[in-house]
Amino acid sequence: MKLADAIATAPRRTLKGTYWHQGPTRHPVTSCADPARGPGRYHRTGEPGVWYASNKEQGAWAELFRHFVDDGVDPFEVRRRVGRVAVTLQVLDLTDERTRSHLGVDETDLLSDDYTTTQAIAAARDANFDAVLAPAAALPGCQTLAVFVHALPNIEPERSEVRQPPPRLANLLPLIRPHEHMPDSVRRLLATLTRAGAEAIRRRRR
């Protein structure tokens, strides 16, 4: 069975709950580029937009840490808009092993830096799913919610603020999954931030 056909016949889950998102300070918490300006895990460049969130606040920040550290930037110096939202969505639940089996994919496919499989799973948009729920690539134990732009009206912002990452999140750095081809310079930056710890970040901000 082709992946698109498997998605069309996959079970649907009604997802209700609260999720966390962080993004640029200049945009509302529930906005995304549409069409997408660049590729992402569950979208290709030029496709309808996808908005990403995490089931935990630290999961949302972990995505920032993963990408900014890769660029050689200290993520604790970056200001972002972070917020909590309430969702009611029909999702393709890839955290469920039976659903993954139905699609013929495994967790390794979902976490890989090769987005070929996950971008193909975005066919769920054309099968009238609102979103994809999947294991998070950045922080083990968290879940990523990838919401297709047509379903953004089903997301209710509860609160948001512009801030730097809390210093306590320095404890997350050793837990974040690195990209598969992380340069040595990035590994050194990550090690420096980890050694500095939360208290050093607090002192730096005083």
UniProtKB/Swiss-Prot annotation:
Belongs to the MbcT/ParT/Res family. This is Probable NAD(+) phosphorylase Rv3189. It is an enzyme of class 2 (transferase). It comes from Mycobacterium tuberculosis (strain ATCC 25618 / H37Rv). Probable toxic component of a type II toxin-antitoxin (TA) system. Degrades NAD(+) by phosphorolysis. Neutralized by its cognate antitoxin Rv3188. GO terms for molecular function: nucleotidyltransferase activity. It comes from the Bacteria. It catalyses: phosphate + NAD(+) = ADP-alpha-D-ribose 1''-phosphate + nicotinamide + H(+). Forms a heterotetramer with cognate antitoxin Rv3188. InterPro entries: RES_dom. Keywords: NAD, Nucleotidyltransferase, Toxin-antitoxin system, Transferase. Its EC number is 2.4.2.-.
